[in-house]
Amino acid sequence: MDQDHLKNAKNATRRVGRLRSLGIVTVGGAALVAGITAYKNQDQLFRTFVMPAVRLLPAEASHQLAVLACKYRLCPVSQYHDDQNLHTSFFGRMLSNPIGIAAGFDKNAEAVDGLQDLGFGFIEVGTVTPAAQEGNPKPRVFRLTEDKAIINRYGFNSDGHQAVLQRLRLLRKKENFNGVVGVNLGRNKTTMSPIADYVQGVRVFGPVADYLVINVSSPNTKGLRDMQSKEKLRELLEQVNDTKSSLDKNKNVPILLKLSPDLSLDDMKDIVWVIKRKKSRVDGLIVSNTTVSRENIEKNKLAEETGGLSGPPLKARSTEMIAQMYQLTDGKIPIIGVGGVASGYDAYEKIEAGASYVQIYTALVYEGPALVEDIKAELSALITRLGHTNVADVVGTNSKFYLPK
């Protein structure tokens, strides 16, 4: 077969695949819309009907459907009133609660309004790359249902900087929108200048974001995690901070660093050395990304799939690492804790280990939108029951307990 015929065949196959995905999402979407139209605001419907039905779809198709549901604001609007003890400061902004949606759900800033409807205190979009890219070949998302976990190897599929920027600009123009939105920055798969990709991200999104995340910890882009090494990270963060200081607008935008849970203690010490230096400092940490480890999961053929594991099997390791980073930084660098949070109790553990804020994602896939209210209500009750006035009073109070034994 000559090259032109081969290229045409590949393009035809790709179009068929896209049409098939569109069909799956459209049919699933029709069912979802019908259910919501009839029973909107009844959380029990989501748990007993909508979520099980959505999970019958292929994992990536159900993800696309969930994004569409939030994009068109079809999910129940939260009626929960955040208790005063959940209110907390977030890099100069006030949050009504410390629970956020992690990057990876709304990769392209399409669903921010709908996510805010669910009651999140802050929203992180991305990962966003400079140029649009499709990511890794499909299938690339796998549910480990028995563990309520997910393995993904998306590979930074992204609409690119300019498309996401336009959406965020439109969002900021809305009179009734006052949400806290962070942008998670990545590099293109084929880039020859990885640092330049992050620098460009700071330049593009610095003026419109409430915070920026330097993501060098995804396991699904070759060579990315190498950028967590001491000298490479120092060089990257120095250039990021130089770019931030040169911004015409919002030059105090907080810079956060997202870390892998697979780092050794020596790796963590090297990172702390870097981020304590003035030129390569960061304003916060996100602990942690997905893991390549397959510990704490049931025997399952899907567990052999390549990619990052998220959900309950990651919970203990991410909490342990939060405690380690809290201790190594003397509690002076705010931490967003993420990994396996599925309840208010899980969130409380992350916070007493050293996290000031908590993000969720995988549990939302299994439990549905009512989970956000459930986590907040349980967390608020725990704070009161255990004798604290505010969530900020809990941060790091039991950090040493979670350190490796």
Swiss-Prot record:
Q: What is this protein for, i.e. what is its function?
A: Catalyzes the conversion of dihydroorotate to orotate with quinone as electron acceptor.
NCBIfam families, sorted: PRK05286.1-2, PRK05286.2-5, pyrD_sub2
Gene symbol of the encoding locus: Dhod
Q: Which catalytic residues are annotated?
A: 218
Per the record, the GO terms for biological process are:
'de novo' pyrimidine nucleobase biosynthetic process; 'de novo' UMP biosynthetic process; pyrimidine ribonucleotide biosynthetic process
The UniProt entry lists membrane topology as:
Single-pass membrane protein
Name the coenzymes or cofactors required: FMN
Subcellular location per UniProt equals: Mitochondrion inner membrane
- Name its species: Drosophila melanogaster (Fruit fly)
| Chain sites annotated for binding FMN | 103-107, 127, 184, 215, 258, 288, 311, 340, 361-362
Task: Tell me the superkingdom of the source.
Answer: Eukaryota
Q: GO terms for molecular function, please? A: dihydroorotate dehydrogenase (quinone) activity; dihydroorotate dehydrogenase activity
Q: Which InterPro entries match?
A: Aldolase_TIM, DHO_dehydrogenase, Dihydroorotate_DH_2, Dihydroorotate_DH_cat, Dihydroorotate_DH_CS
Q: Cross-referenced Gene3D superfamilies, in alphabetical order? A: Aldolase class I (3.20.20.70)
What's the chief localization of this chain?
mitochondrion
Keywords, A to Z, come to: Flavoprotein, FMN, Membrane, Mitochondrion, Mitochondrion inner membrane, Oxidoreductase, Pyrimidine biosynthesis, Transit peptide, Transmembrane, Transmembrane helix
- Record-given protein name: Dihydroorotate dehydrogenase (quinone), mitochondrial
Q: Pathway of this protein?
A: Pyrimidine metabolism; UMP biosynthesis via de novo pathway; orotate from (S)-dihydroorotate (quinone route): step 1/1
Q: Name one GO cellular component term.
A: mitochondrial inner membrane
Q: What is the lineage of its organism?
A: Eukaryota, Metazoa, Ecdysozoa, Arthropoda, Hexapoda
User: Which family does the UniProt entry place this protein in?
Assistant: Belongs to the dihydroorotate dehydrogenase family. Type 2 subfamily.
Which EC main class describes this enzyme?
A: oxidoreductase
The UniProt record gives the binding positions of substrate as 107, 152-156, 215-220, 289-290
